């Protein structure tokens, strides 16, 4: 029984990442550039229908909706080698084509104006699914479209599909040297929606992605294409258990339930090893990829795709390792024992200290130089330090009332700047929740989340 997932790509970053993600899925499932199954793709055992549907002429078409307020990236996708795999009706480019000017308010307001057209596309895709499980959204939170239009769509999806899961892959800005001066404003406003309207958020930040790409590829300034390749590798790895199902973690709700012990703490960080791929071929090869080696590397902070400054109390709430390739379950058991003996991972004091492992097969159609590769999805309290940096940078700008005029012109701010204050309160509540989770008496505390009434997730 397929449990379909509809993918929404919003803005320049979301669509660039999405383009590479679909290319990777096509290669892994033996689908050619026109959407036809290659003659050699006869192995079976994979579920293509989670992410693709078959058209009347039996071509595989992504269940994807591509949204942007300016045409450049979508036009480049429409002229790319894989242009024929998409449903042309699922491209939405705003008729003015002016973009959102790196302004969350403008992206949000434009979403409000055009939401009926976009929801028609989503309804059409949902009606074409037998048993829709949920949505995946790809976007960044620093600019205008991915953050503003993305926020608006999260709210609408919650209203229209209250029982469906929403998972996002959200690219956070490099908080050290971002190229958009107003990114703290856009990030904070988006964070509120990610907290209240998503069930699970995979956090990737540009600072960490650039560092990992530079480290592995030996290039000083990795291109966006190279960092997007890392994101699409993580996305394809995190969906392998859905596409090559085993007994466990074979649907999105299973993955989310195993990683998120309390509903608000649903921001996940990832590690992946070893990196290889078309655009990453300069990556230094790691000679011996045993299960233990892969699992140990996944726990190394330098492999995390999030820049955090963990404190002494920071700890894991949950870990799911997705191991692809030739892995023997007894090796996994031994590796887990070794990790426990060496105390390589510190867990919350009030829950089970368990690393969950899902073994999945690799695509038979993609050659890999590694026997085993692994992705770690982890819920770690240290992620709150990233949110603290966003709040601190927001407060610095707000104190000076810097760059607020362009926001005041937009609909969400017509009655003042309360939208900012509410967002800050929600994010501070989230930070407090993660910090409280580090205490042994977390579950027995009587404090309820302040914004429970606002919480719209499918819990």
Curated annotation (Swiss-Prot):
Name any one GO molecular function. GTP binding
Q: Pfam families from the entry?
A: Tubulin (PF00091), Tubulin_C (PF03953)
- Which PROSITE patterns has this protein been placed in? TUBULIN (PS00227)
Subcellular localization, as worded in the UniProt entry: Cytoplasm, Cytoskeleton, Microtubule organizing center, Spindle pole body
GO terms of biological process kind: cytoplasmic microtubule organization; microtubule nucleation; mitotic cytokinesis, division site positioning; mitotic spindle midzone assembly
The positions making up the signal sequence are: none
Task: Answer yes or no on keyword Cytoplasm.
Answer: yes
- Write out the entry's keywords from A to Z: Cytoplasm, Cytoskeleton, GTP-binding, Microtubule, Nucleotide-binding
Is the keyword Amino-acid biosynthesis assigned to this protein?
no
Q: Which GO terms describe its cellular component?
A: cytoplasm; equatorial microtubule organizing center; gamma-tubulin ring complex; gamma-tubulin small complex; half bridge of mitotic spindle pole body; inner plaque of mitotic spindle pole body; interphase microtubule organizing center; mating projection tip
Q: Where does GTP bind?
A: 142-148
Region of interest called Disordered, as start-end residue ranges on this chain: 440-459
InterPro entries referenced in this protein's UniProt entry, alphabetically: Gamma_tubulin (IPR002454), Tub_FtsZ_C (IPR008280), Tubulin (IPR000217), Tubulin/FtsZ-like_C (IPR037103), Tubulin/FtsZ_2-layer-sand-dom (IPR018316), Tubulin/FtsZ_GTPase_sf (IPR036525), Tubulin_C (IPR023123), Tubulin_CS (IPR017975)
Protein family per UniProt: Belongs to the tubulin family.
Q: Summarize the protein's role.
A: Tubulin is the major constituent of microtubules. The gamma chain is found at microtubule organizing centers (MTOC) such as the spindle poles or the centrosome, suggesting that it is involved in the minus-end nucleation of microtubule assembly.
Q: What is this protein called?
A: Tubulin gamma chain
Q: Which organism is it from?
A: Cochliobolus heterostrophus (strain C5 / ATCC 48332 / race O)
């Amino acid at each position: 029984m397929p449990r379909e997932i509809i993918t929404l790509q919003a803005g320049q970053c979301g669509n660039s990442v999405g383009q590479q993600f679909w290319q990777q899925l096509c290669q892994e499932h033996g689908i050619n550039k026109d959407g036809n199954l290659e003659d050699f793709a006869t192995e079976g055992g994979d579920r293509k229908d989670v992410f693709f549907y078959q058209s009347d002429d039996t071509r595989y078409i992504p269940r994807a909706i591509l949204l942007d307020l300016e045409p450049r990236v979508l036009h480049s996708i429409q002229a790319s080698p894989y242009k024929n795999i998409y449903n042309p009706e699922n491209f939405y480019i705003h008729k003015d084509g002016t973009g959102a000017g790196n302004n969350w308010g403008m992206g949000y307001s434009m979403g409000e104006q055009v939401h009926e057209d976009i929801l028609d596309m989503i309804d059409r895709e949902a009606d074409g699914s037998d048993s829709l499980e949920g949505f995946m959204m790809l976007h960044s939170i620093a600019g205008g479209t991915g953050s503003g239009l993305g926020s608006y769509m999260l709210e609408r999806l919650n209203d229209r599909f209250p029982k469906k899961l929403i998972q996002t892959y959200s690219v956070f800005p490099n908080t050290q040297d971002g190229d958009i001066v107003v990114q703290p404003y856009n990030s904070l406003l988006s964070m509120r929606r990610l907290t209240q309207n998503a069930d699970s958020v995979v956090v990737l930040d540009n600072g960490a992605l650039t560092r990992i790409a530079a480290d592995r590829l030996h290039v000083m300034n990795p291109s966006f294409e190279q960092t997007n390749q890392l994101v699409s590798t993580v996305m394809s790895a995190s969906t392998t258990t859905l596409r090559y199902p085993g007994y466990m973690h074979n649907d999105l709700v299973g993955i989310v339930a195993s990683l998120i012990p309390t509903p608000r703490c649903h921001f996940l960080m990832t590690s992946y090893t070893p990196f290889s791929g078309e655009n990453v071929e300069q990556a230094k090869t790691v000679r011996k990829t045993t299960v233990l080696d892969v699992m140990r590397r996944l726990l190394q902070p330098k492999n995390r795709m999030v820049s955090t400054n963990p404190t002494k109390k920071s700890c894991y709430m949950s870990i799911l390792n997705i191991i692809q390739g030739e892995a023997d379950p007894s090796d996994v058991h031994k590796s887990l024992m070794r990790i426990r003996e060496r105390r390589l991972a510190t867990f919350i004091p009030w829950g089970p200290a368990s690393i969950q492992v899902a073994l999945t097969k690799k695509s038979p159609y993609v050659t890999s130089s590694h026997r085993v590769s692994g992705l770690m999805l982890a819920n770690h309290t240290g992620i709150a330090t990233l949110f603290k940096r966003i709040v601190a940078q927001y407060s610095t700008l707000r104190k000076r009332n810097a760059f607020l005029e362009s926001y005041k012109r937009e609909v969400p701010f017509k009655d003042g700047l309360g939208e900012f204050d509410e967002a800050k309160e929600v994010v501070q509540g989230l930070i407090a929740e993660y910090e409280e989770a580090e205490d042994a008496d977390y579950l027995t505390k009587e404090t309820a989340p302040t914004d429970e009434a606002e919480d719209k997730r499918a819990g």
